[in-house]
């Protein structure tokens, strides 16, 4: 027996609501991870010659390697923070990213469910229609 489209839609809605509830109860990630004192001592501020080195971030000078490095602002990645991280730009926090991904997956799943139900219905109609010679 194939469940009706309404039953499948209610089932999908129940799963969606359960996942949303679980996401609300989860703890969010730390905004700034702690940095050990030993790590901080390996960096200095960049010299004036490197003020424009990072496109979307803060320049830090690596003492051991004697070269600049970038600490990217939120939403940017790359060696010089030159690439936008589109998911981070659309959804700034980790929780919003998870909810955005969940909404996209739910919409795709519902579209697949609707298409499947329509195809099943069409097959049933063809099966029950009488072929006139």
From Swiss-Prot:
Signal peptide from the UniProt entry: 1-23
Tissue: Skin.
SS bond partners: 46-59, 54-70, 72-81
This protein's UniProt keywords: Cell membrane, Disulfide bond, EGF-like domain, Glycoprotein, Growth factor, Membrane, Mitogen, Secreted, Signal, Transmembrane, Transmembrane helix
Propeptide: 24-38, 89-133
Alphabetical GO biological process terms: cell surface receptor signaling pathway; epidermal growth factor receptor signaling pathway; positive regulation of cell division; positive regulation of epithelial cell proliferation; positive regulation of MAPK cascade; positive regulation of mitotic nuclear division
Keyword field contains Flavoprotein: no
Glycosylation sites: 25
Residues in compartment: Cytoplasmic: 121-133
TM helices/strands, residue ranges: 98-120
Key word Ribonucleoprotein present: no
GO CC field: extracellular space; plasma membrane
Domain of life: Eukaryota
UniProt-listed InterPro entries: EGF-like_dom
Domain EGF-like: 42-82
GO MF annotation list: epidermal growth factor receptor binding; growth factor activity
Spans within the Extracellular topological domain: 24-97
Function of the protein: TGF alpha is a mitogenic polypeptide that is able to bind to the EGF receptor/EGFR and to act synergistically with TGF beta to promote anchorage-independent cell proliferation in soft agar.
Assembly with partners or alone: Interacts with the PDZ domains of MAGI3, SDCBP and SNTA1. The interaction with SDCBP, is required for the targeting to the cell surface. In the endoplasmic reticulum, in its immature form (i.e. with a prosegment and lacking full N-glycosylation), interacts with CNIH. In the Golgi apparatus, may form a complex with CNIH and GORASP2. Interacts (via cytoplasmic C-terminal domain) with NKD2.
Protein name: Protransforming growth factor alpha
Record lineage: Eukaryota, Metazoa, Chordata, Craniata, Vertebrata
């Amino acid at each position: 027996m194939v469940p009706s489209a309404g039953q499948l839609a209610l089932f999908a809605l129940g799963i969606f609501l359960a996942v949303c509830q679980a996401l609300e109860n989860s703890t969010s990630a730390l905004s700034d991870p702690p940095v050990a004192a030993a790590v901080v001592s390996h960096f200095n501020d960049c010299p004036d010659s490197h003020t424009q080195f990072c496109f979307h971030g803060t320049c830090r000078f690596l003492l051991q390697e004697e070269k600049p490095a970038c600490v990217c602002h939120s939403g940017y990645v790359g060696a010089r923070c030159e690439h936008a991280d589109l998911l981070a730009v659309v959804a700034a926090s980790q929780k919003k990213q998870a909810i955005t991904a969940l909404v996209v997956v739910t919409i795709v799943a519902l579209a697949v469910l609707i298409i499947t139900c329509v195809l099943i219905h069409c097959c049933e109609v063809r099966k029950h229609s009488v072929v006139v010679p």
